[in-house]
């Protein structure tokens, strides 16, 4: 089943569960930030990461320590999970085995760093940060999954993004808008998609809008 269809199915199931819980006076659970591999679904609940089989069943804890975990993202081969962790007042990028284990910290900057993806080869984690922006705009960086120095992407500003399979092009969202959840919103703050040819360092903006 294609990922987009699976997400639509999960949302429909979630809505049905919510309605059932309301009818039976049970409290619904706020499950957020789903990421999907070929066999597992990882999500956040109560500031922790949880994992469940795509076929259904009981969810298991992946993180139980003191702190807040969010934004889990499977590596391309499904063996690792990158996520955003907030511990001791700082927000950084971490990576851990998909089956569970000790998280490895990848970023150490005092500015907030948030995991948003992987490079196609699964060797580096993509994250956003405002660490190099005096105007507080977010920019995108990569950091080796094994640890090491960060590399900034050649983009003036970006909050989300994804590589093409050959890593030659990059699609991204330049700025974040709170109206992004409005369907068919066409006002001045609507979110736009932009593309960047990484091999030639030539940017273009198709000004596409989310429907």
Where do the PLM segments sit?
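A flexible loop/linker signature enriched in serine peptidases of the S9 family
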Residues: 45-50, 65-69, 82-94, 102-114, ...
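Beta-propeller domains with acidic blade repeats across secreted/periplasmic ectodomains
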Residues: 61-62
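Residue-level detector of Asp-centered blade-edge/turn motifs that repeat once per structural unit
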Residues: 36-38, 76-77, 120-121, 165-166
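Bacterial N-terminal signal peptides
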Residues: 5-17
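Boundary at the C-terminal end of the N-terminal hydrophobic targeting segment
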Residues: 19-24
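N-terminal secretory signal peptides that target proteins for export/translocation
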Residues: 1-3
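Beta-strand-rich domains and repeat architectures in extracellular enzymes and scaffolds
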Residues: 25-52, 71
């Amino acid at each position: 089943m294609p990922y987009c269809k699976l997400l639509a199915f999960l949302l429909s199931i979630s809505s049905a569960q919510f309605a059932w819980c309301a009818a039976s006076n049970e409290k619904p659970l706020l499950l957020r930030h789903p990421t999907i591999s070929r066999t597992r679904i990882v999500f956040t609940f109560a500031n922790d990461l949880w994992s469940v089989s795509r076929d259904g069943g009981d969810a298991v804890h992946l993180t139980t320590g003191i702190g807040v975990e969010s934004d889990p993202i499977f590596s391309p081969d499904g063996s690792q999970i990158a996520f955003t962790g907030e511990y001791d007042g700082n927000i950084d990028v971490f990576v851990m085995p998909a089956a569970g284990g000790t998280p490895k910290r990848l970023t150490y900057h005092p500015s907030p760093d948030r995991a948003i993806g992987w490079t196609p080869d699964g060797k580096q984690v993509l994250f956003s940060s405002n660490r190099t922006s005096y105007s507080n705009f977010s920019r995108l960086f990569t950091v080796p999954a094994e640890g090491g120095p960060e590399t900034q992407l050649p983009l003036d500003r970006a909050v989300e993004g994804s590589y093409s399979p050959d890593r030659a092009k990059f699609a991204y969202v330049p700025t974040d808008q709170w109206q992004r959840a409005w369907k068919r919103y066409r006002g001045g703050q609507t979110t736009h998609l932009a593309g960047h040819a990484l091999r030639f360092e030539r940017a273009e903006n198709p000004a596409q809008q989310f429907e």
